[in-house]
């Protein structure tokens, strides 16, 4: 696929300092975000739908893809561009069958073997981590702080585009791309920033400064 993955925002209302998810996403769009994932583990189904509908309008107007974490039903209901799946979610093949051949289907992995399996199953892209460790998500200790060597190993294992996630900030994003990632995925580096637009722009500058993986 030809989608840019330079700066990938995963929403996190709990980190947004009282701002709405839509406000943060709108600021990130101004800052140059490439793709947005709607993720909210605490909201009700109705709340997720309402936020998703609002984000769908914002992202579509800006030409930025929107994917939904885990929930195929929500992705279909808001006409999202795709879905991002984890270890405990439905298989990639099922997501593809439900959402169609044009849907973007991503998969979280932490090892080269998992990357190969996801590619064989038909994933479009991968999220690899947690690279530096993170407080934004509950991560299995064995999948935390995997480091840049693991990014290099995953790059050797798959031809799929992938983003590195986990503790990424504007100050440490460049080495992730230098190690082989096509971009970086962040939650709090944007959502918790005093100025999400500026934080997004700093991340974009860091990633874009490390061609040719972007």
Swiss-Prot record:
Gene3D superfamilies: Aldolase class I. Its EC number is 2.5.1.3. GO terms for molecular function: magnesium ion binding; thiamine-phosphate diphosphorylase activity. GO terms for biological process: thiamine biosynthetic process; thiamine diphosphate biosynthetic process. The keyword Metal-binding applies. 4-amino-2-methyl-5-(diphosphooxymethyl)pyrimidine binds at residues 37-41, 69, 108, 137. Keywords: Magnesium, Metal-binding, Thiamine biosynthesis, Transferase. It catalyses: 2-[(2R,5Z)-2-carboxy-4-methylthiazol-5(2H)-ylidene]ethyl phosphate + 4-amino-2-methyl-5-(diphosphooxymethyl)pyrimidine + 2 H(+) = thiamine phosphate + CO2 + diphosphate; 2-(2-carboxy-4-methylthiazol-5-yl)ethyl phosphate + 4-amino-2-methyl-5-(diphosphooxymethyl)pyrimidine + 2 H(+) = thiamine phosphate + CO2 + diphosphate; 4-methyl-5-(2-phosphooxyethyl)-thiazole + 4-amino-2-methyl-5-(diphosphooxymethyl)pyrimidine + H(+) = thiamine phosphate + diphosphate. One of its GO terms (cellular component) is cytoplasm. 2-[(2R,5Z)-2-carboxy-4-methylthiazol-5(2H)-ylidene]ethyl phosphate binds at residues 134-136, 167, 187-188. Binds 1 Mg(2+) ion per subunit. InterPro entries: Aldolase_TIM (IPR013785), ThiamineP_synth_sf (IPR036206), ThiamineP_synth_TenI (IPR022998), TMP_synthase (IPR034291). Pathway: Cofactor biosynthesis; thiamine diphosphate biosynthesis; thiamine phosphate from 4-amino-2-methyl-5-diphosphomethylpyrimidine and 4-methyl-5-(2-phosphoethyl)-thiazole: step 1/1. Mg(2+) binds at residues 70, 89. Its cofactor is Mg(2+). NCBIfam families: thiE. Belongs to the thiamine-phosphate synthase family. Condenses 4-methyl-5-(beta-hydroxyethyl)thiazole monophosphate (THZ-P) and 2-methyl-4-amino-5-hydroxymethyl pyrimidine pyrophosphate (HMP-PP) to form thiamine monophosphate (TMP). This is Thiamine-phosphate synthase. It comes from Natronomonas pharaonis (strain ATCC 35678 / DSM 2160 / CIP 103997 / JCM 8858 / NBRC 14720 / NCIMB 2260 / Gabara).
């Amino acid at each position: 696929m030809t989608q840019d993955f330079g700066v990938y925002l995963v929403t996190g209302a709990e980190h947004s300092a009282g701002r709405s998810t839509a406000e943060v996403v709108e600021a990130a769009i101004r800052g140059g975000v490439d793709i947005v994932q709607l993720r909210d583990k605490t909201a009700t189904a109705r709340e997720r739908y309402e936020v998703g509908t609002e984000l769908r309008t914002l992202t579509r107007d800006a030409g930025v893809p929107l994917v939904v974490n885990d929930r195929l039903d929500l992705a279909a209901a808001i006409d999202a561009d795709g879905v991002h799946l984890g270890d405990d979610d439905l298989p990639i093949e099922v997501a593809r069958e439900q959402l169609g051949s044009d849907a973007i289907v991503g998969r979280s992995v932490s090892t080269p073997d998992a990357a190969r399996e996801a590619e064989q199953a038909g994933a479009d892209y991968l999220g690899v981590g947690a690279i530096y460790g993170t407080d934004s998500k509950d991560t299995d200790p064995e999948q935390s702080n995997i480091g840049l060597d693991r990014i290099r190993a995953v790059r050797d294992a798959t031809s799929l585009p992938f983003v590195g996630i986990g503790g990424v900030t504007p100050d440490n994003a460049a080495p992730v791309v230098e190690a082989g990632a096509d971009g970086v995925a962040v939650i709090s580096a944007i959502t918790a920033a005093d100025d999400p637009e500026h934080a997004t722009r700093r991340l974009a500058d860091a990633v874009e400064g490390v061609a040719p993986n972007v």
